[in-house]
Amino acid sequence: APDPGPGPMGMMGARGPPGPPGPPGAQGHTGHGPPGPPGKSGEDGNNGRPGKPGDRGAPGPQGARGFPGTPGLPGMKGHRGYTGLDGRKGEPGGAGAKGEPGAHGAAGSPGLAGSRGRAGPAGPAGARGADGNAGPAGPAGPLGAAGPPGFPGGPGPKGELGPAGATGPSGAQGSRGEPGPNGAVGPVGPPGNPGNNGLNGAKGAAGTPGVAGAPGFPGPRGGPGPQGPQGAAGQRGLAGDPGTQGVKGDGGPKGEPGNSGPQGPPGPQGEEGKRGPTGELGATGPAGNRSGPLGMPGARGATGAAGPRGPPGDAGRAGESGPAGLRGLPGSPGSSGPPGKEGAAGPAGQDGRGGPPGPTGPRGPSGEAGKPGDKGATGPTGLRGAPGPDGNNGATGATGPAGGPGEKGEQGAAGAPGFQGLPGPAGGAGEAGKPGDRGLPGDQGVSGPAGAKGERGNPGAAGASGPQGPLGPRGPAGAPGTDGGKGEPGAAGAAGGPGHQGPGGMPGERGAAGAPGGKGEKGEAGHRGPDGNAGRDGSRGMPGPAGPPGPTGANGDKGESGSFGPAGPAGARGASGERGEVGPAGAPGFAGPPGADGQTGARGERGPSGGKGESGPAGPAGPAGQSGPPGASGPAGPTGARGDNGPPGLTGFPGAAGRVGAAGPAGLVGPPGSAGPAGKDGPRGLRGDPGPSGPSGDQGMVGPPGPSGEKGPSGPAGXPGXPGTSGPLGLQGFVGLPGARGDRGSPGGAGGVGEPGRVGPAGPAGARGNLGLPGMTGPQGEAGREGNPGNDGPPGRPGAPGFKGDRGNRGESGPGGAAGAVGPAGARGAAGPSGPRGEKGVAGEKGERGLRGHAGLQGMPGPSGPSGDTGSAGPNGPAGPRGPAGPHGPPGKDGRAGGHGTLGSPGARGPPGYVGPAGPPGSPGLPGPPGPAGGGYDVSGYDEYRAAKDYEVDATLKSLNTQLENLLTPEGSRKNPARLSHPEWSSGFYPNQGCSNDALKETCLHAHPGSLARAVVVQGSNDVELRFTFSVLEDGCTRTNKPSRLPLLDLAPLDLGGADQEFGLDLGPVCFK
């Protein structure tokens, strides 16, 4: 139990000798120290037992594309294909022969109202009618029905060429042309005018110290300086007088629980306990928060049995993006970011140490007069003086003046030091400190989003030849060699007996063309092809007979009255009779015969136009007139409905010979031809050299046992006779039936992976790419070697308060020293040498996880780590301020192809193409003519042993050959499609079978339209916005006498997009004089 309370402190005794170490104290309260440094790594523990099998993992990424499988067997014959696509539009044919007049067509539908006709010629003058009485003008009658239309006129002659039409609208922008070759380097221009001031350069390195200047005038008094280093501890002060005993204070409130103390030192290792019995299996616990450490890899399992071959899977999804490429070179430093927001206020610093003593204050007012001192002690009695002579008693004199001050006494002992003065008032703010050294680089920023896939690079230079590959499979049989020279004739052999009829010869050469077959059935109507170009005008056909009148058309506009016809011949002039009185009007007589024309009267004034008369009844159709001159072409009527197919045309002229078709399948072997007559015996030839040993022949059939003859003497070997003339060719056999479908072959094994080729020489350095996106943060590198100590930096700002230190051991009580003045701070000692490395300590128990330490300084960049998995793309950061103009970028990607232009007129026929590369060896040719008949054997009794020739195998082989060729070189037809979609390929031309006439130019990078906040308007030096329109588009320097427009460092073409878009384009400087 604690003592009730200490008594008053006694006087300090003399220093005793140090006591023996005390026993360990009781466990202290939980301390507040910072977490200790991490202990050294313990020795590896024993291997844990293998863990339970983990849950089934998520499906892995899609594997790489497998090697192509072996080609399958030919399938069964497919159904009849669909009608093929329409053929390409043919060139315009020549003018056709003049056709015969067609049959009368059916009446057409009423045409559109014709344009107003020209005035017709005046008709002949009619007979003069009898004069009628002038009746009163009747009211205008109703409009009569339109009269029947006249007969259509014959077609007019072809009109002359019309004037050129107005320029059509501009077509859509064509695709961007290939970049032209670089122009020749122009001559060096004369030096330009001086440019504007450049940007401020980077801060230069520190110069060497200059000569010391003359001492300056004393500056104004500075503000309080930064906190100085802690001074050395002063000597211990004298003991003060014992104070009076204080009153016991009240109990304080209960303190808050302290922070958890640091991990205590590990206790000694206990003895190993006995192994307990195995407990029962507990219930499955909840899933742990952290994944456990990886178990040791288990032993390799036994190979499982091969699973049955699964059906072919569906086409896999497009694989995920590949791993990010290697880390790009460090980008050039980015521009400074915008200033950050003001940080939160830091914690209050510790109280500063006492400032230096303030300046001496003004002199205080005089103090009040002191109190009278105590009466001094009586001094000692002086010696008795010698007796003076007796003076006269004088009168009492006046008081004399005060004596002068005595001499200065010796200096008294120093007084006790006064109490420390109050802190002086705060001084003015000091001058701004010099700029600090450049800070350490900040942590690497978060990786930006993955950049768009770059274009495929230029192909590297060809690598050196790789090592020789393994021997390939045996190639197909070569073409037959040329015939050897004719051997000399051998000696004539004895004539053999006539041989049996030989087996059928191979099919003969193609016979002459047979008589034309009968007319085939009418084929299905093909799809209508695209309209061909207009053919040249045919010769004019004979006018057809007039068709029946069409239905009544709509009323045309009333034509203008025709011009007056030519005057008729003047009639004989009659005698002018006297004018009689007007008699009553008789009934109108019949029209007399036409009288001779009277003289032409003077032209009367034009009367008012009368009302339109009623239309008379339609007269009978007159006889068909001759076909009139062709009228002007009317406007094209609407496209009529599609007519029925016409009767088949006459047989056309034979077309030009077609290209040679692919070899047809071999026909069945024809019946054997009749044996040719035996050739005459040739003269006996000289003995030939022995030939090379031939390949072993097939085993012949077993011959019948002959009677054993006597062994005759071996005669000399006869030379072979000259070949007999070949027999006549057999007829061509019929086409064999397709063979039965073969069984499915067993799958071939996967081919072995070829050896990797040697690394090719490094390609030339590519053009500088665009600035790459910042790479992902690499792993923290190893600590670099210890650097040399740098120069002393300027004093930093006061640091944050440190953690509370550990409690020190109790020091021995020092002797009482007098209080010294604070000494100046000593110079910083040099760093001591590194101590020897201690031995490895015993592994401590695993401590609790410490508090998170401060972020260490950024280490040197480590070696490039392995590429991590691609992280998910972070959100796009805000757009930074516009950086300075970058270097001249490479030419942009090709723009999107423009819309299809109108179909151009067919171009002139191009020159013949270059000779293509030699094609692959063709399929084996047709069998040659049959060779001469060999010597016969008598095999008459063994027909039952002969195998019929397997024609089905031949047909199957031939079909396989054709299908393999179609697989290797697909024709692009529906049965053998050629694939055009290869998004992983790079942009370029993709010819078909090495023929570039129909190559497609495909851009394999597709535009991602977006918006860039980079609309910059440039002003010239005369404060004019540079938004002029320049029309010169030539490569080279252009002279100008307006240097205010130069140099053009940028231009922004306008109206190249929507209303909310503007397109910018950076140019390099324009050369100018």
Swiss-Prot record:
Residues 217-227, 918-932 have a biased composition (Pro residues). Residues 1039-1073 form the Fibrillar collagen NC1 domain. Disulfide bonds: none annotated. Residues 100-148, 178-187, 194-215, 229-239, 296-315, 321-348, 386-399, 411-423, 458-468, 561-575, 584-597, 617-642, 653-680, 708-729, 758-774, 821-836, 857-876, 906-917 have a biased composition (Low complexity). InterPro entries: Collagen, Collagen_superfamily, Fib_collagen_C. The keyword Secreted applies. It comes from the Eukaryota. Transmembrane segments: none annotated. The keyword Ion transport does not apply. Residues 519-530, 837-851 have a biased composition (Basic and acidic residues). One of its GO terms (cellular component) is collagen trimer. Residues 246-255, 424-433, 481-508, 607-616, 745-757, 811-820 have a biased composition (Gly residues). Keywords: Collagen, Extracellular matrix, Secreted. GO terms for molecular function: extracellular matrix structural constituent. It is found in: Secreted, Extracellular space, Extracellular matrix. Belongs to the fibrillar collagen family. This is Collagen alpha-2(I) chain.
